[in-house]
A protein has these predicted regions:
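Conserved, function-critical positions that sit in or immediately flank catalytic
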Residues: 144-437
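Tryptophan-rich substrate-binding surfaces of secreted polymer-degrading and adhesive proteins
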Residues: 1-188, 266-271, 314-320, 340-341, ...
């Protein structure tokens, strides 16, 4: 038996991850102000109990991750003149498959205007010399014979935050933002045929009266025309004049061929939804980049020293105490509101709501909540299923020193050992992680 994890599931997992850490306190941590045995060769991180415990001991400070500090990314491929780009091929997984030489498929390109284009046809493997610039809804042909599809433009704020030498942001828009990308998504052609690849050119076709291209399949409307070499009579290219719609299978034949013979070709069908419908899925947005900025001492929480470890710590506990309450439903409860127990009269302020675990973290507690009583807040109520009073509360502050984090609480989600980074109170560091799914 063989199986794969689909890119759709990988993207779903990446979005679930991003949503979870945006809603529940997750922190960048930095640590280890002491030297590695070899400062140019940091230790390889492990998840042994001993090493995870040592991470807490090494920890210097933490800063909370927010939704605007992360985005989906794909490998950066720049458009450069005289480079060959791979044309989309519906028989390949161009995200994960590799060429015979082990390299990735280069089937999209980023221009210096921060536009991203998908290559639908590369003029039989020719070099691209004309930069694509159009943001039109449909695919377009450049003078060098390439056919490109505009996908999206990297947002100006993301250029500075998430565009690096190796990675670039990728988006699929879920609501009309007035952008060209939205128009491309809304007008994508499901099951369109945007390229026909000539496998064998044949010979002796009449250039004065080119053969008729017939596309047969389960869709409708696709048409194309053949280019014939003026001397050999070979079919040099078949150009799409109408991509049609709703094809899942298609064959290409030539009629009115005269004495011509030997040409074979294959229709390339667009992905589900059509080219440009889902840039994140089409280009392989299975990675998340998290970019955190550390500004000097961060108000005193961060020491201005060296560090050699960084990573993500999910829901650590703080040294502050209060109540952890599991309820039948957290629906309607909001952080910052006061809750009251209907039996005990105990009160407290909601610090954090965790819908997945049906948990309310309560600080500023007066009295003691008990199991089975009902708690109420601003017209919302729920029965307590379990309560732990006088317990350490989840950390929610924006920044905190290591002394504010309870050792061996929370979950390490990412660990990075690196060469020494020296800090000072006038310095800003940018720390980036790539999380793959």
């Amino acid at each position: 038996m063989s199986s794969i994890i689909s890119n759709s599931l990988r993207i779903l997992n990446s979005e679930t991850f991003a949503k979870r850490i945006a809603e529940q306190p997750t922190y960048l941590f930095i640590g280890k102000d002491t030297s590695w045995a070899d400062e140019e060769l940091p230790d390889i991180p492990t998840e042994s109990t001993k090493d995870l415990t040592q991470l807490y001991k090494n920890m210097l400070a933490v800063k909370r991750v927010t939704a605007d500090t992360m985005t989906s990314v794909i490998q950066r491929i720049n458009w450069t003149s005289n480079s060959v780009y791979d044309a989309f091929d519906d028989t390949l997984n161009m995200i994960d498959d590799r060429k015979s030489n082990g390299t990735r498929y280069r089937y999209y390109a980023l221009t210096d205007e921060f536009n991203v284009y998908k290559c639908l046809s590369n003029n039989n493997g020719a070099a691209s010399v004309n930069k694509p610039t159009s943001q039109q809804i449909t695919e377009f042909k450049t003078p060098d014979g390439y056919i490109w599809k505009y996908m999206y433009t990297i947002r100006s704020t993301d250029v500075f935050s998430f565009l690096t030498q190796d990675w670039m942001p990728v988006y699929t828009i879920i609501a009309n933002d007035g952008s060209s990308q939205w128009q491309v998504q809304e007008n994508a052609i499901d099951g369109g045929i945007h390229d026909i690849v000539v496998k064998t050119n044949g010979a002796s076709y009449n250039p004065a009266i080119p053969p008729t291209v017939v596309i047969t399949g389960d869709g409708t409307g696709a048409t194309a025309q053949a280019d014939v070499h003026p001397i050999s009579g070979a079919i040099t290219r078949i150009l799409i004049t109408n991509p049609g719609v709703n094809y899942t299978t298609a064959t290409v034949t030539l009629t009115n061929i005269g004495s011509g013979n030997g040409c074979t070709s294959v229709a390339i069908i667009a992905p589900v939804g059509g080219h440009g419908k889902d840039a994140k899925l089409e280009l392989g947005g299975v990675n998340k980049m998290i970019k955190m900025t550390l500004n000097g001492a961060e108000g005193g929480a961060f020491p201005t020293t060296t560090f050699r470890q960084a990573g993500l710590l999910y829901k650590p506990l703080s040294t502050e105490q209060g109540s952890k309450i599991t309820v039948a439903s957290t629906n309607g409860f909001k952080a910052g509101e006061t809750v009251t127990g209907d039996t005990t009269g105990a009160t407290g302020v909601i610090r954090l709501v965790d819908d997945n675990e049906r948990t309310l973290w309560i600080d500023t507690v007066v009295g003691a909540f008990i199991q089975s009583e009902t708690i109420s807040s601003d017209g919302v109520s729920a029965a307590i299923e379990r309560v732990v009073n006088n317990t350490n509360l989840v950390l929610v502050s924006t920044v905190a020193s290591a002394d504010d984090v309870v050792t061996r609480t929370g979950e390490f989600m990412y660990i990075s050992n690196r060469e020494v980074i020296a800090r000072n109170d006038t310095q800003t560091e940018e720390v980036r992680f790539i999380i793959g799914f």
